Amino acid sequence: MAVEGIVPKSWNWSVSETITTPPLSIIRYSSGVTITVEPNKLQVTDSNVENGPGNSKVAEIASAYVRVLPHVRYTASGNNFQSLIQRDSPDEYLKGRFLKDGPWHDSLNAVGIRLIYPLDTGRLTLAIDTGEAKLPDKADQQAVIIANANFSRNCGNHPDHEQVAEFLGKAMEDWSHYEELLTNIME
């Protein structure tokens, strides 16, 4: 990745782990960024991002990768976000927020929802559910609400590396839309 300039040497990131097999390659960096390459998918994640993608190198890395391999037929691009939301009794909060009272309510353990919104060239899928997570200020796993968003856009041009880079460049716009939507849904 450094040789091709996908992860520039000037960032001084050390590789903490690599896995390389014919169908799968994974590179984990000390910065918290992981690059996963499968036959039909490139995924770049950053585990150390808080408050949006503004300080993350994910879009820059993914854009550099597709520029290095412009001959690949890219069919879609996605910006994905995850938030952990603390609430007292997350299961009860979601049941009260999204489910009408009735006899079905009493024996129900949890409520999870999936919402799908149209985008110009794709769709936004927003999933809200409960789960457990290790929070920075807590020693044990805590019950939380987990929100996952996938802004998926279809590529229509070939070569499409420029279109993929354009879609990846919408990360901050997508984050703002996600934050606003999640705030409106959860409050």
Regions found by a protein language model. Give the residues of each.
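Surface-exposed flexible segments
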Residues: M1-K9, V58-V66, K95-F98, H158-E173
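N-terminal low-complexity, intrinsically disordered segments
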Residues: M1-S47
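Short glycine-rich, low-complexity/disordered patches
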Residues: T18-I19, V68-D88, H105-D120, W175-E187
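Amphipathic N-proximal alpha-helical interface segments
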Residues: I27, G32-K41, T45-S47, N55-E60, ...
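A generic structural motif
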Residues: K41, S47-P53, I85-R87, F151-Q163, ...
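Aromatic/basic-lined ligand-recognition segments
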Residues: D88-N148
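Mixed-charge, glycine-accented linear interaction segment located at domain edges/termini
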Residues: L124-E187
